């Protein structure tokens, strides 16, 4: 598949005994989304990720949600990361770095991205309540960290996500997803001043 700026599209699929997931992402889209995971709150978060990243994002996931949401959420992070990595291609001409602060009522979240080819994840600052809160009867907010970590490792990016402050687990989760979306949008954006790979090593 070509990975020019006119065709920065990535697709990935993964099928296991726990889930069957397919993802398509267009980095140069307009924020159109088509999301179906069987988990309404997770659908809401992925819709926000696509919309605020200005990515055209399609996610189809069938998982053992009757047992737990964990497998579907984490495996979606894996497949989305793989699709994102494919869409990035050689990474020529991109800004490479991006970050964003996102408020949601009482909460403030920050995300920073380096499209480095060196996968790493750091998540910090979430209040203790996030460990045992369940949103909508199906989305345990402790899964946030697993999703972002698997996304980062499979996209081969460095991703840092911070909750600076906040009380409502819904607000914290949504602010984090939106911060990641905006940081990714900035990092993958084309920069006319960058004529090749944005690294002094000549490769990412």
UniProtKB/Swiss-Prot annotation:
Alphabetized InterPro entries for the sequence: IGPD_sf, ImidazoleglycerolP_deHydtase, ImidazoleglycerP_deHydtase_CS, Ribosomal_Su5_D2-typ_SF
Pfam families membership: IGPD (PF00475)
Keywords: Amino-acid biosynthesis, Cytoplasm, Histidine biosynthesis, Lyase
Family: Belongs to the imidazoleglycerol-phosphate dehydratase family.
GO biological process terms, semicolon-separated: L-histidine biosynthetic process
KW Lyase (keyword) present: yes
Gene3D superfamilies: Imidazole glycerol phosphate dehydratase, domain 1
Pathway assigned to this chain's UniProt record: Amino-acid biosynthesis; L-histidine biosynthesis; L-histidine from 5-phospho-alpha-D-ribose 1-diphosphate: step 6/9
Name of the encoding gene: hisB
Compartments, as annotated in UniProt: Cytoplasm
Cellular component annotations (GO), alphabetically ordered: cytoplasm
Primary localization: cytoplasm
GO MF terms held by the record: imidazoleglycerol-phosphate dehydratase activity
CDD domains, A to Z: IGPD
Annotated protein name in UniProt: Imidazoleglycerol-phosphate dehydratase
E.C. number(s) listed in UniProt: 4.2.1.19
Catalytic activity: D-erythro-1-(imidazol-4-yl)glycerol 3-phosphate = 3-(imidazol-4-yl)-2-oxopropyl phosphate + H2O
């Amino acid at each position: 598949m070509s990975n020019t700026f006119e065709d920065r599209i990535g697709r990935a699929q993964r099928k296991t005994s726990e889930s069957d997931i397919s993802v398509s992402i267009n980095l140069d889209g307009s924020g159109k989304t088509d999301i179906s995971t069987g988990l309404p709150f997770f659908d809401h978060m992925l819709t926000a990720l696509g919309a605020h990243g200005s990515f055209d994002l399609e996610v189809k996931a069938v998982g053992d949600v009757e047992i737990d949401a964990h497998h579907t959420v984490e495996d979606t992070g894996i497949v989305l990361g793989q699709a994102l990595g494919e869409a990035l291609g050689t990474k020529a001409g991109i800004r490479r770095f991006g970050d964003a602060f996102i408020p949601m009522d009482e909460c403030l979240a920050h995300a920073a991205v380096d499209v480095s080819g060196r996968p790493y994840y750091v998540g910090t600052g979430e209040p203790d309540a996030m460990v045992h809160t369940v949103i909508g009867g199906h989305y345990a907010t402790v899964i946030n960290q697993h999703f972002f970590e698997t996304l980062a490792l499979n996209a081969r990016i460095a991703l840092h996500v911070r909750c600076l402050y906040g009380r409502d687990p819904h607000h914290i989760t949504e602010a984090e997803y939106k911060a990641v979306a905006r940081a990714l949008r900035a990092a993958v954006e084309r920069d006319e001043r960058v004529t090749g790979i944005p690294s002094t090593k000549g490769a990412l």
